[in-house]
Amino acid sequence: MINTYLTIVLAPLIGSIVVGLGGNRLGRTLSHSITILGVTISTVLSFYVFNHHVLNEGEIFNQNIYTWMQIGGLNISFGFLVDNLTSVMLVVVSFVSLMVHIYTIGYMHEDKGYTKFFSYISLFTFAMFTLVMSNNFMQLFFGWEAVGLVSYLLIGFWHHKESAIEANLKAFIVNRVGDFGFILGIALVLMFFGTLDYAETFSQKDQIIGLTLFNDFSAITVICLLLFVGAMGKSAQVPLHVWLPGSMEGPTPISALIHAATMVTAGIFMVSRMSPLFELSDVALTVVMVIGAITALFMGLLGIVQNDIKKVVAYSTLSQLGYMTVALGVSAYSVAIFHLMTHAFFKALLFLAAGSVIVALHHEQDIRKMGGLRKKMPITYITSLLGTLALIGFPGFAGFYSKDMIIEAVHYSELPFSGWVYFAVVLGVFITAFYSMRLLFLVFHGESRVDKHTEEHLHETAPSITVPLIMLAIPSVVIGYFTIEPMLFGGWLDNGIYIDTSHESVEKLKHHFHSAFSLISHSVMTLPFWMMVGGIATAWLFSLYRTEWADIIQRRFKRINYVLVSLYGFDRLNEIIFVRGALKLGNLLWKISDMAIIDQLLVNGSARFARFVGSFIRPVQTGYVYHYAFFMIISLMLVLGWVLVASDYSFYS
């Protein structure tokens, strides 16, 4: 199996290198064929691995491939840990990446950087595979940073746009903040456990109970919180969420890949993998749960006031990541991964469908300038409808099972603040349904607001775009029904996660729900279902029936609207504190260190000192030869006298 695992990781990397170095000579067709072939190989082998480990209950594979370096007793190796958790992630990442690769053929066909883009997205896939399959913290960090680096390149791919450069710089800097906490957490793991290997670390987890840092703070709590800071950056949790909406400046295919299956899911996966550590600290779990609830609720509210088609979907990603994080906080790791999986399919679908609309409308992204597109773009409309129903949790669709399980898990949690969190995630159902259906209604229903010239030439997009939409629509509908029982109730992920016996949310879920059908029959009597129905009705009311009401409410509640439009002031706050603060600090250091110390003290000061010394020596330079001869004789006598004294020589022996 080791050759299979190596092939999964290396196939996209080889494709990326070949196309990256020789794309111009290879041409467009051969370039995308090579990268798609590499990802296809990884996808097929990922399904094979899934079949071996999950369906046929194969043994966990945990083996080092080679040792990178040895420092004392510390071995830093490159290896693979492949269990059921890894297998599920491999299928999700590879399949979504393959769909994005195929979609890119149609979306980027006129772009000058066509071959370079294919090279980048294949490299992105390799980085995510490295992260998911790692068996130690160092390799995890390598994949973690590689994902961040390639996302920087892809968000700023259209570097001729100033907004794209600002967005990729923001993403890079914000993630460095999270990564700083992450690497500190890894350093503490090394300090307390003496190893970076997962298995060795987890086997010693009980030894850290009761240990403290600085005599006051629980060591395991500090470690988990620092690791979670890294997850907050990658998975865009408040307040490190500000980079994700800006990532829309990149081409739509990479928006889909980042938001669905790679970068933003890295933090969710990492916390799930670290479940043996997080289960030792209720404080850390509570923080994770509360941060997730804040993100789910307040980022969803921002989706209501967005008019850019991609940004509406982007804020839905932020909100759904909040739901996943809430599930992690209540120790429902399998539920979080379940929602990660279902979300990957329908969120990739929604982004690619948005891209289809953008291409058809000649890169128009304002939903207020759309409308009535369902007749001209039936495939895009139907797939968008299916993806939207999955996102809002309509009964029977993929998102319904995973989102409802998160809400129920919170309901059974006994952590502090779980009552408030339950309120937040239930209210989030209404908000999600509202902004999602508002988007669908404004884009595809009602009267057309498209300009006449564009409307005359409006038609469905090419098969390279619509086929991935259809392929992603299928799991967006059925994947939840077919996987909820084995994944949540049958223990698919039991060998990849650990739950302490004191945390009973998942056990209570298993006790109350036994099948997909029981969940559907139960849902119609629950508050989340009626919140979803209310969100749909409200969206229809404001988007189609009484469109003028939206403007009236905007004017009446202009302060609330201002807060939402200004994104709660996070960007403004960051600019004042960090951007301007950094400029002022840099200016101060420039004045003190550069101007005062270096220029005035060292450079000019040394010149002034030389001039001062020279003022004493200058009178000696008279220009008369006999003066110089006199000084030479005196100097020679002094030197001779010093030599005689030093050698203890006497003329009187």
Short names for language-model regions:
Residues M1-L10, L26-S33, L74-V92, T130-G143, ...:
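Membrane-entry segments of alpha-helical transmembrane domains in multi-pass membrane proteins
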Residues M1-T4, G22-S119, F192-F217, T221, ...:
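Transmembrane helix-loop-helix hairpins at membrane boundaries of multipass inner-membrane proteins
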Residues Y5-P12, T35-L45, T86-V93, I121-F124, ...:
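Hydrophobic alpha-helical transmembrane segments of polytopic
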Residues V9-N24, L98, M232:
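N-terminal signal-anchor/start-transfer transmembrane helix
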Residues L37-V54, G178-L190, S384-I392, P468-L488, ...:
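Hydrophobic alpha-helical membrane-insertion segments
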Residues E59-N75, D197-L213, S402-S413, P486-L519, ...:
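Membrane-interfacial helical/loop segments at transmembrane boundaries in membrane proteins
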Residues G73, E485-W530, L541-S653:
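Aromatic-capped, Gly/Pro-kinked transmembrane alpha-helices
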Residues M99-G143, L149-S464, P475, Y481:
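Hydrophobic transmembrane alpha-helices and their helix-loop junctions in integral membrane proteins
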